[in-house]
Amino acid sequence: MSLLLNHQEALKKAQAEIDASVGTSRLVGAADVPRLGYLRCVLSETLRLYPVVPTLIPHESTADCAVGGHHVPGGTMLLVNVYAIHRDPAAWADPAAFRPERFESAGADGLFMMPFGMGRRKCPGEALALQTLGLVLGTLIQCFDWAAVAGAGEVDMAEGVGITLPRAVPLEAMCKPRQCMVDVLREL
């Protein structure tokens, strides 16, 4: 949500997609999320810039090996820095920019996009997490108009300290129910 508040054009594009695909007579449902391509692009770009954890779960090398030309003795603890991989200029054009459109073309999420890990040790909750994120963010976008707190300027995206990279400054946002969704919200 923080990134969308700083990029209102992306927020409006996601809202327009939801309105066109789902309408305003019901809430976004689980079956809708796979059809909301731009919303999924927003989620992918957000997870690229701010993975849930900056490094994957540590692993231990079972034997001597070479990684990137470096000798790694057996028994060495290995960490994969997803945060750095997702911001590597060799893999991503303009890596610090929030550009959900980069995921619109086929194969854009390829090898270098791995917020949940990859292979046998990939997070088993990835599908559930993406479905839940799609439902929650989609519903928030569908039901409310969002803005940064008046006079605050852009949302501060500075990172705090912690395993999950929390914001240094907690998010404060203003939301107003969308007039077209008031009847649906009343029925909840």
Residue ranges, per PLM feature:
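Central I-helix of cytochrome P450 enzymes
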Residues: 1-19, 46, 73, 77-81, ...
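Cytochrome P450 heme-binding "Cys pocket" and the immediately downstream C-terminal segment
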Residues: 8-10, 126-166, 170
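Conserved cytochrome P450 K-helix E-x-x-R motif and the immediately C-terminal K′/meander segment
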Residues: 27-68, 89
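Conserved cytochrome P450 K-helix/beta-meander segment immediately N-terminal to the heme-binding cysteine loop
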Residues: 33, 50, 62-64, 80-106
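Cytochrome P450 heme-thiolate "Cys pocket" and heme-binding signature region
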Residues: 68, 104-133, 158-161
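Conserved beta-strand elements of beta-rich interaction domains across eukaryotes
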Residues: 77, 84-85, 120-121, 135, ...
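Short conserved micro-motifs at the rims of enzyme active sites and ligand-binding pockets
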Residues: 90-92, 127, 183-188
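C-terminal helix/juxtamembrane-tail motif
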Residues: 166-188
